[in-house]
């Protein structure tokens, strides 16, 4: 493996390599070796051999700032592609003239010097004015970089029209050929937005688990049922473009899954519970090797606290990463919909909430001498993948057991009511 002292790319762009002494044992600034894929040998990355196409942004309005390939050697300046070069001398403060071809005419940068800060001082420049427009007026003082930077986009002036940056060739090519797309909000008119936000938000959790051409797509997100600004087909099209998978079969499959889950849960999600209904929720979710678990009491009739606000508060209190916010809110929405479904089907019949509150109160102080209320606190554990799967299996097993007990109690209550009605008929 061979190493070679290199300058970082920013040094070449900023003319930094000319400000160093050209001694044989120059100052080592940057050393890098990159392994190649096909060979075990190392390949030294030579940043000096940059692509001239990177500077195509400077070719604006017929101007050509890079038609001359400039080489700096032995403290002298030479242009290979320019018609002529006069007075190319050392950089100790001497003057030199460079003949350039700008806007189809010959323009001369004359009487150029380097000041104490090693910046080129331009005393006379014909062909460009202070705004970098074609003119014959002189310029008092400018740096060499300012000539090129004048045509670069000014990000501070882009807030009026975000598409102004597309006037620059390199950015426009990246926009067209790359993954950069316009924001989704620009594709929706204001009238559609007003109609979409007119109704109350009914959030339905959507889960994708798809196998397609050797790829596994797993994703979870929330869908506002009252938002008509985008259809499942449009969402599937944008979703596949983001994944670089433009398969019509995959788009149709994603759209059908979304519509199927919306159809199954729309009635339950839109159901309003008029009276207070307190339930105990055991919430679990995992992000990589971190397993989150919490046990709390939730009122299904209370709309002041949404799952999104609850998830944000939990993440802030525990100092978790923001990736936990959609995971916790998604899991809480799914749990609430399961509980509402049991309530609609008549399986949720309870006169007392098993919240371990003192004296049988609806909420309040809990008497827990052994555990000191540790079961009612959020906690995050670092577990292996097998341990997380084991926890999820145990949770599903406990939920099935509780459902069987609830069904048995409900059947026993209906049987007693039927016996009472039969006795009254006799």
From Swiss-Prot:
Stretches the record annotates as Interaction with STH1:
201-242
Other facts: Present with 3940 molecules/cell in log phase SD medium.
User: Which cysteines does the record link by disulfide bonds?
Assistant: none
- For the keyword Nucleus, the answer is yes
Alphabetical GO biological process terms: chromatin remodeling; chromatin remodeling at centromere; chromosome segregation; double-strand break repair; G2/M transition of mitotic cell cycle; nucleosome disassembly; regulation of nuclear cell cycle DNA replication; regulation of transcription by RNA polymerase II
UniProt modification remark: Phosphorylated in the G1 phase.
Q: State the UniProt keywords alphabetically.
A: Cell cycle, Chromatin regulator, Nucleus, Phosphoprotein, Transcription, Transcription regulation
Family per UniProt?
Belongs to the SNF5 family.
- What is the protein name given in its UniProt record? Chromatin structure-remodeling complex subunit SFH1
- Metal-binding keyword on record: no
One GO cellular component assignment for this chain's record is: RSC-type complex
Q: Which GO terms describe its molecular function?
A: nucleosome binding; transcription coregulator activity
- Compartments it resides in: Nucleus
The UniProt function text for this chain reads: Component of the chromatin structure-remodeling complex (RSC), which is involved in transcription regulation and nucleosome positioning. RSC is responsible for the transfer of a histone octamer from a nucleosome core particle to naked DNA. The reaction requires ATP and involves an activated RSC-nucleosome intermediate. Remodeling reaction also involves DNA translocation, DNA twist and conformational change.
The record's Pfam families line, in alphabetical order, gives: SNF5 (PF04855)
Chain positions found as Phosphoserine: 78
* Assembly mode: Interacts directly with STH1. Component of the two forms of the RSC complex composed of at least either RSC1 or RSC2, and ARP7, ARP9, LDB7, NPL6, RSC3, RSC30, RSC4, RSC58, RSC6, RSC8, RSC9, SFH1, STH1, HTL1 and probably RTT102. The complexes interact with histone and histone variant components of centromeric chromatin.
Where does the protein principally reside? nucleus
């Amino acid at each position: 493996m061979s190493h070679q002292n290199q300058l970082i790319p920013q040094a070449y762009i900023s003319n930094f390599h000319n400000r160093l002494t050209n001694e044989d044992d120059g100052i080592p600034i940057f050393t890098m070796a990159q392994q190649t894929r096909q060979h075990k040998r190392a390949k030294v990355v030579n940043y000096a051999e940059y692509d001239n196409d990177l500077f195509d942004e400077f070719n604006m309005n017929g101007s050509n700032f890079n038609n001359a390939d400039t080489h700096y050697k032995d403290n002298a300046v030479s242009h290979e592609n320019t018609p002529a070069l006069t007075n190319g001398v050392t950089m100790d403060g001497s003057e030199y003239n460079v003949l350039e071809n700008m806007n189809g005419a010959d323009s001369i940068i004359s009487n150029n010097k380097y000041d104490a800060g090693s910046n080129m001082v331009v005393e006379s420049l014909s062909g460009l004015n202070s705004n970098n427009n074609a003119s014959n007026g002189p310029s008092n003082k400018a740096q060499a970089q300012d000539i090129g930077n004048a045509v670069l986009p000014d990000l501070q002036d882009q807030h009026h029209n975000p598409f102004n940056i597309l006037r620059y060739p390199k950015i426009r090519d990246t926009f067209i050929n790359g993954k950069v797309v316009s924001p989704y909000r620009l594709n929706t008119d204001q009238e559609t937005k007003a109609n979409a936000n007119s109704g109350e938000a009914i959030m339905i959790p959507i889960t994708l688990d798809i196998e397609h051409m050797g790829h596994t797509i797993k994703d979870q997100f929330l869908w506002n049922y009252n938002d008509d600004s985008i259809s499942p087909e449009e969402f599937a099209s944008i979703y596949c473009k983001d994944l670089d998978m433009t398969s019509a079969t995959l788009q149709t499959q994603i759209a059908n899954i979304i519509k199927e889950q919306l159809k199954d849960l729309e009635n339950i999600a839109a159901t309003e519970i008029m009276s207070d209904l307190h339930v105990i929720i055991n919430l679990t979710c995992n992000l990589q090797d971190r397993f989150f678990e919490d046990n709390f009491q939730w009122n299904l009739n209370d709309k002041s606290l949404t799952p999104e606000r609850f998830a944000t508060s939990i993440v802030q209190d525990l100092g978790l990463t923001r990736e936990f916010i959609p995971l916790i809110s998604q899991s809480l929405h799914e749990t609430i919909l399961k509980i509402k479904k049991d309530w609609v089907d008549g399986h949720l019949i309870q006169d007392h909430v098993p919240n371990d509150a003192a004296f049988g109160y609806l909420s309040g102080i809990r008497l827990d001498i052994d555990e000191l209320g540790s079961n009612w606190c959020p906690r995050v554990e670092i577990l292996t993948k097998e341990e997380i799967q084991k926890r999820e299996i145990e949770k599903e097993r406990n939920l099935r057991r509780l459902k069987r007990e609830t069904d048995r109690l409900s059947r026993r209550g209906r049987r007693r009511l039927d016996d009472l009605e039969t006795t009254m008929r006799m």
